[in-house]
Structure formats: C-alpha cells, structure tokens
Amino acid sequence: MIENRDVVIITEFDGTKIVVINDIVFKGKQNIDWDNVKEYLKGYIGDFYEISESAEKIYIGSKLSDEYTNSEARKALRGANAKAKANAASAIPELIQIASNPKWEENRKIKHNDMAKYGWYRYDVKFAIPVYDNEILIRYNIYGARLLVNHSHNGKKYLYDILEIKKETSKPHHFAW
C-alpha cells in the first residue's frame, strides 16, 4: 500500500463521483519518467480495493506496472493526457472505488487466455488534476478514462491498465469544499 497520498473523492450535483488528485507526483508534460511511474505502481502489488457500487474486489497484480507504463496505448499519449495518466497512478485505490458502468467483453488474444480466462471488464472513471500558475492553484482539469480489468483463471479480477484518458472539454472546475 502506498501512503501519504493527497487524494479525495467528491460527488457532483448529478451524483457523478470524481477522484480529485491534489498532489502532482509526476511533474512535466513532455518528459515523464515512466520508469519512476512503474516503480511507484509496484507499491500497490498485492493490494485489493473494492468498487463501491458493486462490492467487487479488484486486485493489483504484478502485470499492472509494466502494462500501465509500456502499453501501446500509453506510448500514444502526449502532453496533458500523458501527465494525467502518470498522476492517476497515485489514485488507483480511489479510481477503483468509484468505478462504474461495467462493460464485459470476451478475451480475444491467445496470450491472455490464462489471465483473462473469463474476459475483460471496462469501468468508467473520472478524475481531476490541479492546474497551477506560478505555484498558485487556478483550476482543475477533469479527465474521463476506463479501467481495464482482467477476470483471471483463479476467479479474481485484476486491474490491468487505465485507457481512453480524455480531458473533458466542458469548462474547468473550481472545486470548493
């Protein structure tokens, strides 16, 4: 378990939950050190977290850190979306907790036959990253994403990656709580 994280869950007026990441662990947009992100994620291995709306347990296995940092989807990310994915690593427990709208799909790749014997699930999540100007917080950018979870041969579900990270184009949020 990784400690000393400054992450909270808030609920919007419509009931949508957003994970607010208050502490930027991985700074910069251009040159994120993905090896540091990989090492950070290893701190979760062996943990499990529960999805609030379904009480399903999602485990963190040893494959997460490599897939999260080296997947083709990650390599395609640039700028703010890459920074958002890197910093979402600090909010894995809360992102799992707010996961909603599960979509199941059959495993289609032979190489995943064991680890995704019972298929894949994609869950919707939202998170917020602070934007600073000269070290003064000016707003939060909101991102939507999908948690990719494999349903393994042992019956457990494991977080495999976070995909489809997209900045919301609505007006930026100024949270007050």
Residue ranges and their predicted role:
Residues M1-W177:
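Ribonuclease/tRNase effector modules and their secretory precursors
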